[in-house]
């Protein structure tokens, strides 16, 4: 199954690694592909893909929203609301997280 994870913070990276370990195809969506943590994650998970939020939402048959609650709406807008239609969305946001 193709899983797109929107958000490259600790929650997104841990979930992406776990899904990869179960044999799933994973794309980690980030606003900053050159971020040190993201590059380290990619080195440790060479089968994982990196992309923009929009690339990730298009890629995933399942979409995991793993961003802070205060930026969730912006992340969905950047991903393109149309890419969420008829897909399973797992929302891990926390309304008090930045």
Place the predicted regions along the sequence by residue:
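Rossmann-like NAD(P)-binding element
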Residues: 44-48, 52-90, 94-98
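NAD(P)+-binding Rossmann beta1-loop-alpha1 motif at the extreme N-terminus of oxidoreductases
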Residues: 1-40
